[in-house]
Amino acid sequence: MKKTFLAMAFMLLLIVPSTILYASAQTSQSYTLTGAGSTFIFPLMDTWRVQYNNLHSNIKLNYQSIGSGAGIKLLTQKTVDFAASDAPLQPSEQAAAPGTVTIPESIGGITISYNLPGIDKGMKLTGPVIAQIFMGNITMWNDPAIANLNPGMNLPAQKILIAHRADGSGTTYAFTDYLSKVSPQWKTAVGQGKVVPWPVGTGAQGNAGVAGIVKSTPYACGYVELAYAYQNNMTYAFVQNADGSAFVEPTIASVAADAAAAATSLPAPDGDWSKVSIVNQPGSNSYPISTLTYIFVYKDMSQISGETQDKSQEVKNFLTWIIHDGQQYASPLLYVPLPSAMATADDQAISEIQFGGSAVPEFGPIAALVLAIAIVSIIAVSAKTGLRITPKL
């Protein structure tokens, strides 16, 4: 018995230092993860960048907030670890980036923000009226279509100055998805997409660009992600819900209500997400212009330029963190945390990420070497001491 105990203790002495050495090696290895795309998610993504680096000082995130379309393009060129978008991949994009998985990361709202001197937030607008404004058919702030929805509001006899996105934008995709659902005329004349032929208005880059135009231009109006509207102290409309029963303020609660009605059934991680939409969902408290935000990543990350197996594991670790612990940072920035069922589905998607056709292990090649050395050591000690290491049948 004493002989067996000493042998086991000796084996532990062999394994523990090796494990410590491995952990030390892992901690000292630095990685820069790369992502690009959505400006909609940038305030939250940047918070994730800072908070994750506080926890893992050897991991840095370089995220380019360049618009969903540009981010997806970099993914198809295989020059970034992941792309972020407020719009799901369309069939043509999925064909250009075969083998990707879709990971919902958060949920956000899109405001109709305006700059009317002397008028606070809360102008009431319906979907059809919003469509007519952005088509250029309603051109004045005191138009009867707006005035009749807002009795007692001192609307100016001033021209509406429209600001819209000029870049390929997931925010545009979600906004025009909404307009296409509430206005047959919009659907036919303009349609839905990351880039559309805007009938009127001035284009700007990113949510920040549109917010900047509206904020600095009296009588301007544009569509701006909720976090940007709050951060820039912008005024925004209350939009009529899908039921037509109320005008709903964009808040975390009202966006969450809209998402809850839609996100009960989602495609497989590598399936067709192109028809997924959460805009204009039923419910008296549902804000109708809301969207999921997504991360796209290749199942086989070995095809990414400069990728390694260990770095692939760090990408998986980061993605797992943002859909679980990272969700605590969503609400303070006016994003809606993922429902638990959606986070569970994301876990499945992340588990499918591989490197070179093999599942990315929890530990890299160094760990495999450490384990091999430990096993050889155990066998050697066992042979010398006579300790039995196989189960007795």
Task: List where the protein language model places each region.
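Flexible loop/hinge segments at secondary-structure junctions
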Residues: 23-359
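Secretory targeting signatures
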Residues: 1-27, 358-393
